[in-house]
Amino acid sequence: MDIDPYKEFGATVELLSFLPSDFFPSVRDLLDTAAALYRDALESPEHCSPHHTALRQAILCWGDLITLSTWVGTNLEDPASRDLVVSYVNSNMGLKFRQLLWFHISCLTFGRETVLEYLVSFGVWIRTPPAYRPPNAPILSTLPETTVVRRRGRSPRRRTPSPRRRRSQSPRRRRSQSRESQC
């Protein structure tokens, strides 16, 4: 089977492969980031988003892979074979997990569309011959280029909603407090 873990999110393995391997933080740093930013949602029994689900699965699979590699390292007598296993896990599997964790954390942090635009613009930049491309690579940011940042000072006058535009109070439109705080 040829399964692309990014397909349902509008990306592909090839699109992420344009980013160099040293672009992605270590798995430990990514796991710490996911825990710091999204621990409540990841540990919640409720479904928050497909990105949360994918992150949960990646974190569980990484834990299983580490358990397996620890077992192999403990039970493999030949040091050369042990080093080959560790090297393979770190270079091949480690990179795949770093890409997967980075993608889903970035989508939750910046928004899926922003991440996809970044991947496309980086892919175009990296394939452009150095003589014809700008010296700096695109940067993933929460602020699109068209955003205008206002100077400090008086904030603009806020509009109060008119009575005609009240939100419906029907039960199907209300959200539970616990879900809002976790996701």
UniProtKB/Swiss-Prot annotation:
Residues 177-183 are annotated as: RNA binding. Sequence repeats lie at residues 155-161, 162-169, 170-177. Residues 155-177 are annotated as: 3 X 8 AA repeats of S-P-R-R-R-[PR]-S-Q. Pfam families: Hepatitis_core. Keywords: Capsid protein, Cytoplasmic inwards viral transport, DNA-binding, Host cytoplasm, Host-virus interaction, Microtubular inwards viral transport, Phosphoprotein, Repeat, RNA-binding, T=4 icosahedral capsid protein, Viral penetration into host nucleus, Virion, Virus entry into host cell. Self assembles to form an icosahedral capsid. Most capsids appear to be large particles with an icosahedral symmetry of T=4 and consist of 240 copies of capsid protein, though a fraction forms smaller T=3 particles consisting of 180 capsid proteins. Entering capsids are transported along microtubules to the nucleus. Phosphorylation of the capsid is thought to induce exposure of nuclear localization signal in the C-terminal portion of the capsid protein that allows binding to the nuclear pore complex via the importin (karyopherin-) alpha and beta. This is Capsid protein. It comes from Hepatitis B virus genotype D subtype ayw (isolate Japan/JYW796/1988). The gene is C.
